[in-house]
Amino acid sequence: MKIWFDGGCRPNPGVIRTAVVTGGRVWHRVDHGPGDNNDAEWLALLDALAVARGLGLRDVVLLGDSVMVVDQARGRARRVLPRFRDYQARFQDATAGFDRVRVRHVGRAHNLAGIALERPEIWRG
């Protein structure tokens, strides 16, 4: 099943918000605390796996617009800064129990979670 993920913060760095979209439903999180856009994207990817697990899915395609996070999650990044290695390890641990997890890049305009994250009410309060 396809699952879109996106994360952001305002200002950058600032309070992180994430969105996950699948099956016509949207999940938002506003409780991650502070970080930058890269932290937000990684946390959104981890949220996407948590949603998939909660729905009982076993074969997922995770779609995000952060090239850096997609490449790092797929193990294809040439260089991973030390601060992102924990996210990488958490992602690998979170994939346990799934039959198949694929991570793919999509353009921003095609990221349904990104579109959901742009809703103004997400950024209030």
Ranges and model annotations:
Residues P34-E41, V80, F84:
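Active-site beta-loop-alpha junctions of metal-dependent nucleic acid enzymes
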Residues G8-P13, L46-E118, R124:
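RNase H catalytic domain
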Residues M1, W123-G125:
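Short intrinsically disordered terminal tails
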Residues M1-D39, A50-G54:
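RNase H-like nuclease fold core
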